[in-house]
Amino acid sequence: MCIRDSVWVAYTLTDDNELVIKYQATTNKLTIVNLTNHGFFSIQGIGNPTPTIDNIICEVNADFYLPIDETSIPTGEILKVEGTPFDFRKPKPIGQDINADNEQIKNGSGYDHNYVLNKKEEGELSFAARIKDPVSCRTMEVYTTEPGLQMYTGNFLEGIKGQHGATFPRRSAVCFEAQHFPDSPNRSYFPSVRLKPRETY
């Protein structure tokens, strides 16, 4: 029997300046589902004297993160952020430790790691991250029902063309990818990404 998956994604812009992303998936046979988005956010805006995200103030609601190997795959460990460049529990500039002499920073060429979000209950909609531009005071908050949040700082982007002839340099935007943990199918102790028939993701 062939696997027949049905996937539904809805993007909604609200009058409260929210972007709401909802996913739904069903299957007729056991399969793997771990949906996310890879939107880049450059809240400093075009014309900002500091075009990179180095001065953007960031907060991530996580006590733990997943270290990666040199191919950017999680090693399977779950490590504390405390005392590392990955500690964003208190707001700090993204660029403060992005070039630190740290093996994990080197493996990701910056931040490209999954955070284990602090949750009171599985599946609850809760605060995950916040960024603020200190110049314009623009602020973006991320809430999710997912257990993980991949933070990617545009480490491999260079010279991307944008609106009004603007060119975006390396690390000029950040991604917050709410999801289950990467490599979950190979790690039985990670939150499961298996979807069974008659279940709804």
Regions found by a protein language model. Give the residues of each.
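An exposed, glycine/acidic-rich loop-and-rim segment of catalytic or binding clefts
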Residues: 4-201
